[in-house]
Structure formats: C-alpha cells, structure tokens
Amino acid sequence: MKVIGILPFKNEEKFLPTYLSNVQPICDEIIAVDDHSTDNSRQIMEDAGVIVKGYEDTEKLKGGWTCGLIRQHLFNYAREAGGTHFVCLDADETFTSNFVPIARDIMSQLEPGEKVHMQWLALWKSYTAYRDDHTVWSRNFKDFIVADHPDLDYSYNYMCEGRTIGPNNNDTLRTLEVEHGGVLHYQFACFNNFL
C-alpha cells in the first residue's frame, strides 16, 4: 500500500503547516498543484518535501482549466508515483486527532474503488466549536480517501462536488461516524476574515 496525499492549493500559507503536520504521518508522499500562489505557499510545501507541480505543468490541457481537471491531473501524478490509496483534503482541512492513528489500518481494509466517507466538521467562529445545528454545515459527509481502481476517473466540475475519483454510492462508500474520525474545516473558524 502506498498512500499519497493530493492537494490543489493557492495562497494557503496560513493553513499549510497544520495540514502538513496532520497529513504527513498518514501519507508516504504528497503531490500538489500550485495555482499561481503569490504568498509563501509553494516554498512551505517544497521545504516539507512535497512534490509541487505548477499550473504551467498542466496548462496545455484541452477543454480549459477547471477544478475537476486539476484533481484529475493530481490523481494521474499520484498513479504515476505508484499510489494505491489517495488522501484528498484541502489545505484548510485536517483529520480529527482520533483518526490519524487508525488511518492506515482503515485504508488497508478498503477494496479497490472503495472510499472513506467522513463527517465534514465546519469549525464555526472558533477553533473549538463546529456547527451541529441541522443546517447544510452540519451532518455533512464527504469522501476524503479512496483506494484506487484503474477504471476510475474524476468527472466532476467543481471541488465542492466531490474529492475522490469514481462514483459515490452505497457500494463504494465506507462511512465513519465521528467517534472514529472526521475532517475539520477551518475556513469559517476565523469568521472576522469575512467581515
């Protein structure tokens, strides 16, 4: 089993140290695409040993540049590097601390094409509270890890529609309850940034 983290990023320097400290213990390698960052993001990633592809590496794609194409090319790079399992978090996300020690064991149990489906915990106006109020921001589950299968590809157009390659259905999703792990989303933790 070779676990590769894949990450599209742009101007994420404030989140990358936390992302890296959380994901590196799980992954054998991380491959990222930098979409024209103007901050120190690329340097942070390279200093951490991440393989960073620039936008120019995939600029010659036919059909324009979309988030789906970025993700598909990240999967292609990860496959070329021998990846069998892929971790698909964004830079402003981390796994909960209870998941990190069991992550590789859970991944090793996945059949090709199976995914780990976890609760997406939207931190709300703080780093200590997440929304649990029966809105779109609570009880929201997403796929963040997939065991590769050669027939899978990424066919979505937007990042928010899916992270991993292949279809999401009852046959492919292995859902974890938050007692076993979740994903913390930091975008709204610093709510004053949006005011």
Regions found by a protein language model. Name each.
Residues N11-I26:
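Short, well-formed alpha-helical segments that are part of the catalytic scaffolds
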Residues C27, G83, E111-G113:
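Short, high-confidence coil segments that cap the C-terminus of an alpha-helix
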Residues G82-T96:
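Short beta-strand-to-loop acidic/aromatic patch adjacent to the donor-nucleotide binding site
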Residues K2-I4:
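Cell-envelope/extracellular polymer assembly enzymes that use nucleotide-activated donors
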Residues G64-F75, T96-L195:
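Catalytic-site signature of metal-activated, phosphate-bearing donor transferases
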Residues V33-M45, D57-E59:
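A conserved acidic beta->alpha catalytic loop
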Residues L7-F9, D34:
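Short beta-strand/turn micro-motifs composed of small residues
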Residues E46-L69, H73-A81:
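Conserved donor nucleotide-binding strand/loop of the catalytic core
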